[in-house]
Amino acid sequence: MASRQNNKQELDERARQGETVVPGGTGGKSLEAQQHLAEGRSKGGQTRKEQLGTEGYQEMGRKGGLSTVEKSGEERAQEEGIGIDESKFRTGNNKNQNQNEDQDK
């Protein structure tokens, strides 16, 4: 029990010195803050995946993976002839809204 407490104190001290001690906890100023950041980032990504569906989430990752400091993922995809199907990005609510707009035309 004391060993676990010492380990936690050591990790907290390293976090306070600016080291990332929890995967996904970048930016947290303490062990607890890093744990909360990592949990929130994980939940945010999972929520987005649920909204977009697996295909949309993969397309978005493909586009994001092409981006650089100089160019957006869209610009790089166009230059390199890589097709990105942005229709897969739309969430369930957007799909319904777009269908309604199409009917109005």
Swiss-Prot record:
Induction: Down-regulated by drought in 30 days after fertilization seeds. Not regulated by drought in leaves, cotyledons, hypocotyls and roots. Coiled coil: none annotated. One of its GO terms (biological process) is response to abscisic acid. Residues 7-17, 38-52, 71-89 have a biased composition (Basic and acidic residues). Residues 1-105 are annotated as: Disordered. Residues 93-105 have a biased composition (Low complexity). In seeds, expressed in the embryonic axis and in the cotyledons. Not detected in leaves, stems or roots. It comes from the Eukaryota. Belongs to the 'natively unfolded proteins'. The drying rate significantly affected the structure of the protein. Late embryogenesis abundant (LEA) protein interacting with non-reducing sugars and phospholipids. Belongs to the small hydrophilic plant seed protein family. This is Protein SLE2. The lineage of its organism: Eukaryota, Viridiplantae, Streptophyta, Embryophyta, Tracheophyta. The gene is SLE2.
